[in-house]
C-alpha cells in the first residue's frame, strides 16, 4: 500500500504527486513550475490592479480579498515545494504508523482507523467541491455587471484590460482558475485536517489500550508489558504531533493574520455596498474564510481534547491492584501525559476553539473601530 492508498491523505498527495509538488521525478519536475508560475504572474497583475483601484474602497476591498486568497494559496504551495523533503519524510512516518495499526491484532483500533480514513476522504472531497463551486461563482459574477470586468481584476502598465480583444483573451485565460486554484488552495487544508484526524485516532486507540490494562486474569508482568507498550506508543504520538507542529506552525500564524484582516475588511465592505450581487458574494467569501479557519482550529482542538482523555485513562488504570514497579512507572507516565500535545500558531498560541473565537473577536473589534472612525 502506497501513501496515495491511505485515505487520510491520499487525494491530496495524489494531486501533489501528479503536479510534482511532492515526489517529483526528473521527467515530471517541470509540472510544478507550469502549475505555480502562471498563478504567480496573475497574482502580480492583481497587485498592479489594486494600486489602480485605491480610490474606490469597495472595489479595492473585494479585489484585496482575491489577491490575498490567491497569495495565500501560492504561499502554501511554495511552502510544500521548499519543504518537500520534510513533508515527504513526515508522510513516510505517517505511513509507518498507519501500517503498524492496520497490521496489528487490535480490531477496535483498525475500526477507528477506517472511520478516520472515511472522515478525512469525505472532508477532502467536500473541500475541493466547495472551493470549485466558489470560484465558479466568482467566474460568472462579472456577466451580471453592467460594466466590463474580469473575475479577478488584473492590470498591466500601458494596457487597457477592458478593450477588445484583450478583455476576451484575459477572460478566457481565467476560465481554468476554478480547477487550478482549487488544486492549489484546498489540498493543504485537507492535508492538515487528515493529519490531525490521524493524530486524534492514534490517541483514541491509546485510550482504548489503557482501558485494557487490569483485571484478575492479567499477571503482574503482563500488566507491566501492556503499560510499557502504551508508553512507547504515546511517545510515538507525541513525536508525530511535534513534527506536524514544526511543519505548519509558521504558515498557520501567517494565515491567522491574513484571514483576520480579510474578515475585518469584508465586514466593513458589507457595511458600505448596496449591490445585492456584491452582498451575496461578500457573505459567501466571509463564510469561506470562517470555514477554513474553523477546519484548522477544530481539528487541532480535537488533538488537545483527546490528549486530556489519555491523561484521564492513565488515572483510571487500576494501579492499586499492581506492584510497586508498575505504580512508579504509571506515575511517571501520568506526569508525561500532563504535557500539552498541541499545534501552536507560530509556536506561541495553541490552536484551539478558544483561539478561533479570539481571532473572530479581534476581527470584529477592528471592524467596529474602523466603522466608528469612518462613520459608515
Swiss-Prot record:
> Is ATP-binding set as a keyword in this record?
no
Q: Which GO terms describe its molecular function?
A: ionotropic olfactory receptor activity; odorant binding; olfactory receptor activity
Q: Which residues lie on this side of the membrane: Cytoplasmic?
A: 1-32, 80-123, 200-247, 298-342
The UniProt keyword set, sorted, is: Cell membrane, Membrane, Olfaction, Receptor, Sensory transduction, Transducer, Transmembrane, Transmembrane helix
The record, for InterPro entries, names: 7tm6_olfct_rcpt
What spans does the record annotate as topological domain Extracellular, numbered to this chain?
54-58, 145-178, 269-276, 364-376
**What domain of life does the native source organism fall in?**
Eukaryota
Q: According to Swiss-Prot or TrEMBL, what is its membrane topology? A: Multi-pass membrane protein
- GO CC annotations? dendrite membrane; membrane; plasma membrane
Give TM regions: 33-53, 59-79, 124-144, 179-199, 248-268, 277-297, 343-363
Q: In which tissues is it expressed?
A: Expressed with Orco in 20 sensory neurons on the distal edge of the antenna.
One Gene Ontology term of the biological-process aspect is: detection of chemical stimulus involved in sensory perception of smell
* Protein location: Cell membrane
**PANTHER family attached to this UniProt entry:** ODORANT RECEPTOR, ODORANT RECEPTOR 30A-RELATED
Q: How does it assemble?
A: Interacts with Orco. Complexes exist early in the endomembrane system in olfactory sensory neurons (OSNs), coupling these complexes to the conserved ciliary trafficking pathway.
Q: What does this protein do?
A: Odorant receptor which mediates acceptance or avoidance behavior, depending on its substrates. The odorant receptor repertoire encodes a large collection of odor stimuli that vary widely in identity, intensity, and duration. Complexes with Orco to form odorant-sensing units, providing sensitive and prolonged odorant signaling and calcium permeability. They are necessary and sufficient to promote functional reconstitution of odor-evoked signaling in sensory neurons that normally respond only to carbon dioxide.
Name the family. Belongs to the insect chemoreceptor superfamily. Heteromeric odorant receptor channel (TC 1.A.69) family. Or30a subfamily.
Further notes on this entry?
Answer: The atypical heteromeric and topological design of the odorant receptors appears to be an insect-specific solution for odor recognition, making the OR/Orco complex an attractive target for the development of highly selective insect repellents to disrupt olfactory-mediated host-seeking behaviors of insect disease vectors. Odor-evoked OR currents are independent of known G-protein-coupled second messenger pathways.
Its name, as the record gives it, is Odorant receptor 43a
Amino acid at each position: 500500500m502506497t501513501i496515495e492508498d491511505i485515505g487520510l491523505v491520499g487525494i491530496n498527495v495524489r494531486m501533489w504527486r501528479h503536479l510534482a509538488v511532492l515526489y517529483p521525478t526528473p521527467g515530471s519536475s517541470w509540472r510544478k513550475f507550469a502549475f505555480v508560475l502562471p498563478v504567480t504572474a496573475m497574482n502580480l497583475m492583481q497587485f498592479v490592479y489594486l494600486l489602480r483601484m485605491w480610490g474606490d474602497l469597495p472595489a479595492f476591498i473585494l479585489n484585496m480579498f482575491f489577491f490575498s486568497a490567491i497569495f495565500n494559496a501560492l504561499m502554501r504551495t511554495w511552502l510544500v515545494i521548499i519543504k518537500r523533503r520534510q513533508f515527504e519524510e513526515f508522510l513516510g512516518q505517517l505511513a509507518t504508523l498507519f501500517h503498524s495499526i492496520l497490521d496489528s491484532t487490535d480490531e477496535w483500533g483498525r475500526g477507528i482507523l477506517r472511520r478516520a480514513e472515511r472522515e478525512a476522504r469525505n472532508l477532502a472531497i467536500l473541500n475541493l467541491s466547495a472551493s470549485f463551486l466558489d470560484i465558479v461563482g466568482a467566474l460568472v459574477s462579472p456577466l451580471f455587471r453592467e460594466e466590463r470586468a474580469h473575475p479577478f481584476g488584473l492590470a498591466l502598465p500601458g494596457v487597457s484590460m477592458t478593450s477588445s480583444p484583450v478583455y476576451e483573451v484575459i477572460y478566457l485565460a481565467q476560465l481554468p482558475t476554478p480547477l487550478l486554484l482549487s488544486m492549489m488552495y484546498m489540498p493543504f487544508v485537507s492535508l492538515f485536517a487528515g493529519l490531525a484526524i490521524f493524530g486524534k485516532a492514534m490517541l483514541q486507540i491509546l485510550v482504548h489500550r489503557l482501558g485494557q490494562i487490569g483485571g484478575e486474569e492479567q499477571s503482574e508482568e503482563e500488566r507491566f508489558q501492556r503499560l510499557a507498550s502504551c508508553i512507547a506508543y504515546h511517545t510515538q504520538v507525541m513525536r508525530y504531533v511535534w513534527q506536524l507542529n514544526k511543519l505548519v506552525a509558521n504558515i498557520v500564524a501567517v494565515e491567522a493574520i491574513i484571514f483576520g484582516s480579510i474578515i475585518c475588511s469584508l465586514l466593513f465592505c458589507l457595511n458600505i455596498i448596496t449591490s445585492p450581487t456584491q452582498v451575496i458574494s461578500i457573505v459567501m467569501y466571509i463564510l469561506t474564510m470562517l470555514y477554513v479557519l474553523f477546519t484548522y482550529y477544530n481539528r487541532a482542538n480535537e488533538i488537545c481534547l483527546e490528549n486530556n482523555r489519555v491523561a484521564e485513562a492513565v488515572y483510571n488504570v487500576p494501579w492499586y491492584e499492581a506492584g510497586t514497579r508498575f505504580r512508579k512507572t504509571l506515575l511517571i507516565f501520568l506526569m508525561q501525559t500532563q504535557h500539552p500535545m498541541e499545534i501552536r500558531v507560530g509556536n506561541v498560541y495553541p490552536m484551539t476553539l478558544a483561539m478561533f473565537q479570539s481571532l473572530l473577536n479581534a476581527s470584529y473589534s477592528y471592524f467596529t473601530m474602523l466603522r466608528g472612525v469612518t462613520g459608515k
